[in-house]
From Swiss-Prot:
The protein, known as: Putative pterin-4-alpha-carbinolamine dehydratase
InterPro entries cross-referenced by the UniProt entry: PCD_sf, Pterin_deHydtase
GO molecular function: 4-alpha-hydroxytetrahydrobiopterin dehydratase activity
Keywords: Lyase
GO terms for biological process, alphabetical: tetrahydrobiopterin biosynthetic process
One Pfam family hit: Pterin_4a
Organism in which the protein naturally occurs: Saccharomyces cerevisiae (strain ATCC 204508 / S288c)
């Protein structure tokens, strides 16, 4: 089996579209700019039951990230994981760099599904 890497183009989320896309991501913390006008990204922390489950989860996230060409920032220590999602390469016409994009939301939903499967 061959997995083809497909880099998904991203577009910044702003205004009403941003708020609409954030609604289902209730387990993610929103990171705002100092003026609270731009979403800079989202973070989520999770603790797994053991080391093996933690790394099984991280493997799934890394494989999906690689396939989509969009990689979260990951911090981990034994059973604890913190994920940060934001997009660096948004076209400047869409606003400041490093903000939330549609691909971040898509990745967050996929990560949520992995967490749900591995913590129940």
């Amino acid at each position: 089996m061959h997995n083809k890497i497909v880099r998904i183009a991203s577009s910044a989320l702003t205004g009403g579209k941003l708020l609409e896309k954030l609604k289902p991501l209730t387990r993610w913390e929103v990171q705002w700019d100092p003026n609270k006008t731009k979403c800079l990204g989202i973070t989520r922390e999770v603790t797994f039951k053991d080391y093996e489950t933690t790394w099984a989860f991280l493997t799934r996230v890394s494989m999906r990230s690689h396939l989509w060409g969009h990689h979260p920032l990951i911090h981990t220590s034994y059973t604890w994981v913190k994920l940060e999602l934001h997009t660096h390469d948004i076209d400047p016409k869409d606003g400041a760099h490093s903000q939330l994009s549609d691909i971040d939301v898509r990745m967050a939903k996929r990560i949520d599904s992995y967490i749900d499967e591995m913590t129940t």
